Amino acid sequence: MPSYRPPKIASSEITPRQVYLRRREFLGAATLGAMALYGAGKASAAAFSAVESKYKVDEKTTPIKDVTTYNNFYEFGLDKGDPAALSGEFKPLPWAVKVDGMVNKPGTFDVEALIKEFPIEERTYRMRCVEAWSMVIPWNGFPLAALLNKVEPLGSAKYVAFETVVRPEEMPGQKGFFQSLDWPYVEGLRLDEARHPLTLLAVGLYGETLPNQNGAPIRLVVPWKYGFKGIKSIVRITLTDQQPKNTWQVTNPQEYGFYANVNPAVDHPRWSQASERRIGGSGFFGASRRPTLPFNGYADEVASLYAGMDLKANF
């Protein structure tokens, strides 16, 4: 795998200054900030003793207001603003993730304990939605590989399946009229994708506790894939030898595949993927248009995972 070449850019240079300063102030009082954001429950201060990692991009980050108010999270509603408006009753603590299947050491793990166990990094990634819009987000989290190593996958395990929580009493989209999706929301990766150093379990963004509308308290971030692969509010991770289906693949297999790698050469049946709207930019309605990069700009790191594959057939 080619070595990662981080651009020479500091966090204070890519982040709007007022947000950067607020984040550093937050880090000095993480417990109070986390409790205020989560409401119920006591969040771990260790969650935000994050260190900046080599994983950065030489691009301006999306304003936190846009990151937290322009979301797809159908468990809370169909509109981009619904997750922020309708997730106030969702309780992200206490929270546990069950890891089972083809592993030597299955278990159910408290998220706060995982945050204390694994070093939390700050990673700034591009995020490309399949709907042809994008953001640049500074996440806080730990590699999924760290959790997988803890449970020791069997040699026969080839895939990793993920499952979102089902709480219709707190997630109005799960009991609303939009029932073309079967709950729980599910996703999957190949095991080598899941173990890749870029693949992250995020517990925060912009140095703060992960908001409900962004997938609290723990979500997946796979920056070279379309955003729907980033399953939110995870409650179960299963190692298997069978390729798992994902929710959108089941719902519309002609439009959504298992891999969902960002590919400007493979259009969605209803729109082009050659370019994207960068949310929070200076263009029309606050979005600027730019060419989409193969694998969302991470080709040097991940293209070898798909050597010899037909990327049009395996979309």
Curated annotation (Swiss-Prot):
Keywords of the record: Metal-binding, Molybdenum, Oxidoreductase, Periplasm, Signal
Matches recorded under Gene3D superfamilies: Oxidoreductase, molybdopterin-binding domain (3.90.420.10)
Entry's Gene Ontology cellular component terms: periplasmic space
Family affiliation: Belongs to the MsrP family.
Cofactor(s) needed by this chain: Mo-molybdopterin
Textual note on the cofactor: Binds 1 Mo-molybdopterin (Mo-MPT) cofactor per subunit.
Cell compartment(s), UniProt: Periplasm
Record-listed E.C. numbers: 1.8.5.-
Record-given protein name: Protein-methionine-sulfoxide reductase catalytic subunit MsrP
Gene field: msrP
Binding-site list for Mo-molybdopterin: N71, Y74, E75, C129, T164, N214, R219, G230, I231, K232
Leader sequence residues: 1-45
Annotated GO biological process: protein repair
Function noted in UniProt: Part of the MsrPQ system that repairs oxidized periplasmic proteins containing methionine sulfoxide residues (Met-O), using respiratory chain electrons. Thus protects these proteins from oxidative-stress damage caused by reactive species of oxygen and chlorine generated by the host defense mechanisms. MsrPQ is essential for the maintenance of envelope integrity under bleach stress, rescuing a wide series of structurally unrelated periplasmic proteins from methionine oxidation.
NCBIfam families given in the database record: PRK05363.1
Catalytic activity: L-methionyl-[protein] + a quinone + H2O = L-methionyl-(S)-S-oxide-[protein] + a quinol; L-methionyl-[protein] + a quinone + H2O = L-methionyl-(R)-S-oxide-[protein] + a quinol
PTM annotation: Predicted to be exported by the Tat system. The position of the signal peptide cleavage has not been experimentally proven.
Description of how the protein assembles with itself and partners: Heterodimer of a catalytic subunit (MsrP) and a heme-binding subunit (MsrQ).
Any GO molecular function: metal ion binding
Pfam family of the protein (one): Oxidored_molyb
